[in-house]
């Protein structure tokens, strides 16, 4: 098992915090976002880690990682960044992580152990967090519907009702070589322009429409997404509450507890 962190973007909604470095190097709760991701992945006993760089690539140099580059980071989207790591995706099962999220190592462990060619983690306890982040949580949330067997049924559409959202996609997934082959086959059918602008949830929905099975792993909190300076302020405040369900931090001796 390997891990790939998608860190090519600037994070324009972070304001001037990303003038000099990419979003993943934003300081949060005493570490950078990237540090939190690397620590969680390593605590889940995954040692081979690659980072896909783009904006201000020279600033991303943590020890023990290899690099892939997306030189077109400014004109492409997340799926194009993922494809820059195809060398790994073709050979081994890979945990894929966005670079603007933090999460408990146990979520990574559960994802790594779950069967399936394409598997995604999702948060069943998303609504309280989104209600804190947004005046109307539905302004940002997207549909997430499951089949009776727990596989993904649909994802990524706008909605005006909470009943269309059975969980929040987290930006954390696992892809096997066979799963990546299915993704590559789909991407070959798309125009270059559509490929360049394809986001991850749109890719997942297209895969579903092609008949691809996507398995899911539920979690209840213990992660969060940092998308703005407002998020940073909110989370720094919530970390003072011992009962905050989305506190992702862990004691190194208690990861497997």
Predicted regions and their residues:
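Short alpha-helical oligomerization interface
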Residues: 19-24
